Every structure is written in C-alpha cells, then in structure tokens.
Regions:
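Short glycine/serine/threonine-enriched helix-capping/active-site loop
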Residues: 22-23, 47-51, 77, 141-142, ...
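Short, flexible, basic/aromatic active-site loop/helix in glycosyltransferases
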Residues: 68-94
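Short beta-strand-to-loop acidic/aromatic patch adjacent to the donor-nucleotide binding site
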Residues: 17-28
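Conserved donor NDP-sugar-binding/catalytic core segment of glycosyltransferases
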Residues: 27-62, 67-69
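Non-catalytic, C-terminal membrane-associated alpha-helical segments of glycosyltransferases
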Residues: 158-166, 177-228
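Glycine-rich, basic loop-to-helix element that forms the pyrophosphate-binding segment
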Residues: 1-15
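A short, conserved beta-strand element in the Rossmann-like catalytic core
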Residues: 2, 26-29, 52, 119, ...
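A short, conserved alpha-helix in the catalytic core of glycosyltransferases
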Residues: 94-145
C-alpha cells in the first residue's frame, strides 16, 4: 500500500499476533521471504528484506539505507547495482524504506503509529528518526528477498509536492514557528520562480508546480492529503 500513514489499521494486523508487516502493492515476494524475516529479526528490532527491481530482477532497488536526521535526507544503498556478495551481509542500518518493513507489536506500542499528517511520502523517514530516538535497532536482512516494480508516481507532480512539503515538516519538527518560516523562504522563492517560468513557456503543471505548492502549503500549515 502507498498511503501507509493509515496505520491505525495496524491494530487489526497485530491483534492476533506479535508482528505487523507493511508491504507496498507494487511488489512481488519470494515464497520464503516472510519466514526468513521472522526467523532472523533480532528481538526488539525492526527489519526489512533485500529489495530488487522486478525488471531487471537481479538489480538492487534497496539494500539498506542511511538517514541524516537533521536534514531528513536518505540514501538507498546499492541502488541500481547488480545483486552480489556485497549485498549478502546482514547489517544494522539507520534507514528502512516502508515499501516493506516488519514491525514487532512491542515496537509499535513503544514508538506509536506513523504520522498521519504526512499522508504520503517521508512517513518512513519520520518513523525511522523516532525509532532511533527510542533506541530501536533497524536491520537489513538480505536472505529475505522481494521485488519492487518502482517508478509508478515517483517523480510526478504529486510525489514532488508531498516530498517538498513533508521534508520541510520533518526538518522543522520540534523547532519554533519562526524557524519553520525562515526554512521555507528559499523553497518558496525557488519554487515560485520555476513555476512562473513553466507558465511563461506555456507548459502544463508538473514538478515545478508540485514543489511550489508543497512549500506554500507547508507555510500555511496545510498537511494531510493535498486539496484542490
């Protein structure tokens, strides 16, 4: 599922067990991937499998990640590299994409649900920051493998909108209102300039509008699903 912030649904998932699995609907899984995740996840930790592209099926989409909590920027390790021995090591990481993640019930009860104000994109970044703050380790477990279609809406106007707005939200979270306004000025100005140029050239709304609108909505405190 893409709108993973509706994680009140986790309550139903964990009612009969000790784990919840979040999995995008643009994935295919190997028959034993969940068995391996459950068997190899250390106690009290969150984990994810190795994620390969569907096409080509031997190319890495995600092999663990790195997160800078100050900027909210993340790096997918191994992206677009051919799968091989260098991606076969179980390791602790600072970021896990919620394209597929195994969450123990105890961790959900400790850290809470995903932030619904984000609605879409960056919810995994926020949650990984909270996991780190709570001392919950995150593990990349390469023996478990899934394939991800990827692409989809990535790079489109909506994804740029949510990423722009939600990244500003994350970098300003816990800061003063004055800091948030100051942090938004540059994205507002650059977004406005690029969108104005797009209109001047007679092009349709696209990435430039998404970035501009994302900054505007954050400035105005509009979170959740994009309206209008």
């Amino acid at each position: 599922m893409r709108w993973t912030t509706g994680v009140q649904h986790i309550a139903g998932l964990i009612a009969a067990g000790n784990f919840a699995l979040l999995l995008n609907n643009d994935t295919s899984v190997r028959p034993d991937f969940l068995e391996k995740l459950l068997a190899e996840t250390p106690a009290g930790a969150v984990s994810c499998p190795k994620m390969l592209f569907m096409d080509p099926p031997d190319e890495i989409w995600f092999a663990g990640g790195e997160l800078d909590p100050k900027t909210g920027k993340v790096k997918h390790l191994g992206g677009h590299k051919k799968d091989g021995p260098e991606f076969a090591e179980k390791k602790q990481v600072s970021f896990i994409t919620f394209c597929c993640v195994l969450l123990p019930r105890a961790v959900i009860e400790k850290v809470g649900y995903l932030d619904e104000t984000l609605f879409m994109y960056c919810e995994d970044v926020d949650y990984c920051i909270r996991l780190a703050q709570a001392g919950v380790p995150m593990w990349f477990l390469p023996d478990a493998v899934i394939h991800h279609k990827a692409g989809g809406s990535a790079g489109g106007m909506l994804s740029v909108y949510y990423i722009t707005r939600n990244t500003l939200y994350l970098t300003c979270k816990g800061k003063s209102a004055a800091y948030a306004k100051l942090k938004t000025i540059l994205p507002l100005l650059t977004g406005a300039a690029r969108y104005a140029l797009t209109k001047l050239l007679g092009r349709k709304k696209g990435r430039s509008y998404g970035a501009f609108r994302g900054a505007v909505d954050f400035w105005n405190g509009k979170m959740g699903r994009m309206k209008g």
